[in-house]
């Protein structure tokens, strides 16, 4: 496993020619309040890039080009949050997207455990540690444990998508999943605009 650490942006996009797995680390769970600290990406070849985002930085041309490339699928787990913080920070909408959490909810209806750790354990037989999830991602220097954790969140998303796609096809829910994925950028905008805790489709 190769992990490359960068500051401010990806140096280039040479490794990213197909679908890309993406995750983010922030100072908290409120996109309108808490800043983006790290963007981690994996091209699906067993390697990962961990990009530290300095406070106040909003100009990452290679990252923004990748996020907005209509020909490259972006794979997230809980894309709703990541899309919101990326939009808040860089002012761009990431499309097209795939969310493994939504795919899990549409297929693994026999359980309420849809966290990445639980899905990877059951679907792929892979154990990942979440010990560093609640740590100071805004630190000037990340620890080796933080870097390894960040990479682990994206290294398996391509394989997980493949397996969840098989389950979506088996259950006849592919079109429903695709419709959900298309709506995600708008859902992220609603969250940032003040409707994060409200179901606008509810009767009351």
Residue ranges and their predicted role:
Residues 1-204:
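DEDD superfamily 3′-5′ metal-dependent exonuclease/proofreading module
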């Amino acid at each position: 496993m190769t992990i490359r650490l960068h500051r401010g942006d990806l140096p280039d996009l040479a490794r990213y020619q197909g679908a890309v797995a993406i995750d983010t680390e922030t100072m908290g769970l409120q996109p309108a309040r808490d800043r983006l600290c790290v963007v981690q990406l994996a091209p699906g070849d067993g390697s990962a890039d961990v990009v530290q985002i300095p406070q106040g930085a909003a100009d990452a041309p290679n990252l923004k080009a990748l996020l907005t490339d209509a020909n490259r699928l972006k794979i997230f787990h809980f894309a709703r949050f990541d899309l919101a913080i990326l939009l808040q920070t860089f002012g761009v909408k990431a499309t097209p997207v795939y969310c493994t959490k939504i795919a899990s909810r549409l297929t693994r209806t026999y359980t309420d455990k849809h966290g990445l750790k639980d899905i990877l354990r059951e679907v792929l037989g892979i154990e990942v540690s979440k010990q560093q999830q609640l740590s100071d991602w805004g630190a000037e220097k990340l620890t080796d444990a933080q870097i390894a954790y960040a990479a682990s969140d994206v290294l398996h998303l391509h394989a997980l998508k493949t397996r969840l796609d098989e389950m979506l096809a088996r259950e006849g829910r592919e079109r429903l999943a695709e419709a959900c994925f298309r709506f995600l950028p708008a859902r992220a905008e609603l969250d940032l605009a003040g409707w994060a805790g409200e179901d606008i489709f509810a009767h009351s």
